[in-house]
A protein has these predicted regions:
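N-terminal secretory signal peptides that target proteins for export/translocation
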Residues: 1-4
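Bacterial N-terminal signal peptides
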Residues: 7-17
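Glycan-processing catalytic domains of CAZymes
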Residues: 22-423
Length: 423
């Protein structure tokens, strides 16, 4: 009762903002990075289309997102009106990741809430056809990181990549980013051990979603190219987005024993845990059954272990047969328990999935507190889905507290903070 009352006060009296200093981009030590999709477009942003909000024009039967973002702080030139959608009889709006003003605003929020930086998703399957679109968002990120003092690094998502060409596509695009866009020359590009961090997500996953390669030697050769065989200016600290069961080669991981050497070759292991558990009890079991042995294995391999945590999950609009609010957020308890357990198990760094992933209901950006604040048409999740009164920035606040915990600024506590505040 007391906790709900305190949260209700927060809705009316947001805390004063503490402006955090620039993040040290030279090391991954104690960092908490958040995935950033940056894939939303609308017709008025120059793309001439709606992307990721829906299949075509947004409507109840075309929506592919769950959470409705809180747009109250966005200016008129950041809002895209949605034809046929209303909120209380007034026009409904969405945003575009192509708008530099909006991306800058997102990074300003990260600074206000004390988040370290982002892993920007870049999709291998779209590079040949849509590289210019990805470049627009990347340039927005580079400018926003500079303004806010947050770090950023590239994270390639290989889902749907051509098994025959994805490796060369990765190499060519990385050389393009280094030579033409000068990403690794940016003062806020995330580095570690003197090299830029590069993440490649999806190798070794065996979930039926088309993650090449199937041959572990191809994967190992690719890692070695990025770490040591390319020209010096392209060398990286290699982060691998792996199956959650990378350590045992079971469940969502390919079972060929040769994959163990692939994972051992990575500098940073980032297992994908999203959707692998859905209750607090399961989170606790996951710590003992998976994270604790993972930490030991990574230490034996002299690797950085970077588990992934997520606030909840729902993709009813994206997968129409999926149930609504599939993995409830439990007012932040689910999110907090994962981060606390990871810290107590020995993890030194963390990834949060994701900043803006409203598609699968994992976003931590500001979203509406009440269903009535979302469009009247269609299914939408709001922060009151679990019956709690929460401010729209609740998950940014919690992410900030998680970051402070990993920085060593606060002691790990299994209890959810009553009033997490912007730093």
């Amino acid at each position: 009762m007391r906790l709900n009352a305190l949260r209700a006060i927060l809705l009316l009296c947001p805390a004063a903002v503490y402006v955090a200093g620039a993040v040290d981009a030279s090391t991954l030590d104690n960092k908490v990075l958040v995935g950033y999709q940056g894939w939303f477009t609308c017709p008025s942003d120059g793309s001439q289309r709606w992307t990721h909000w829906s299949r075509g024009v947004p409507a109840p039967d075309t929506l592919t997102v769950e959470l409705y973002p809180d747009l109250s702080e966005l200016d008129a030139d950041e809002r895209c009106e949605v034809p046929g959608m209303t909120i209380g009889g007034k026009p409904a709006y969405l945003f575009s990741s192509r708008n530099p003003k909006t991306v800058s605003r997102h990074f300003r929020w990260m600074k206000e809430y004390g988040l370290d930086g982002v892993l920007l998703q870049r999709f291998v399957g779209e590079i040949r056809r849509k590289r210019a679109d990805g470049d627009v968002v990347l340039k927005n990120i580079m400018a926003a990181a500079n303004e806010s003092g947050r770090t950023f690094a590239i994270e390639y998502d290989i889902s749907g990549g051509n098994p025959e060409t994805f490796g060369q596509t990765l190499k060519d695009d990385w050389m393009y980013l280094v030579d033409e866009l000068k990403v690794t020359s940016h003062p806020n590009y995330q580095r570690h051990n003197g090299k830029p961090v590069l993440s490649i997500w999806g190798m070794g996953l065996n979930d039926g979603n088309g993650h090449p390669p199937t041959d572990p030697q191809v994967a190992k050769d690719l890692i070695e190219w990025f770490k040591s065989k390319a020209a010096d200016q392209y060398h990286v600290t290699y982060m691998g987005g792996t199956p959650s069961r990378w350590g045992t080669l079971t469940r969502d991981a390919r079972v060929d024993p040769a994959w163990a050497a692939v994972y051992a070759a990575m500098d940073v292991v980032q297992p994908w845990n999203v959707g692998r558990y859905g209750t607090l009890e399961a989170v606790d079991h996951w710590k003992e059954d998976v994270i604790v042995p993972d930490v030991k294995l990574a230490a034996a391999n002299r690797q950085i272990y970077m588990p992934v945590v997520f606030p909840g999950f729902s993709w009813h609009n994206l997968k129409r047969n999926a149930r609504e609010n599939q993995i409830p957020r439990l007012s932040g308890e689910f999110f907090w328990r994962q981060a606390y357990n990871a810290k107590m198990a020995g993890a030194k760094v963390l990834k949060i999935a994701m900043f803006d992933e409203v598609d699968e209901g994992t976003a931590i950006l500001k979203v509406v507190s009440h269903r009535k604040e979302a469009p009247d048409q269609g299914f939408w999740l709001a922060l009151d889905a679990d019956g709690a009164e929460l401010p729209s920035d609740w998950y940014l606040r919690l992410a900030g507290e998680i970051t402070r915990m990993f920085h060593g600024e606060i002691k790990p506590d299994p209890k959810l903070p009553a009033i997490p505040r912007p730093r």
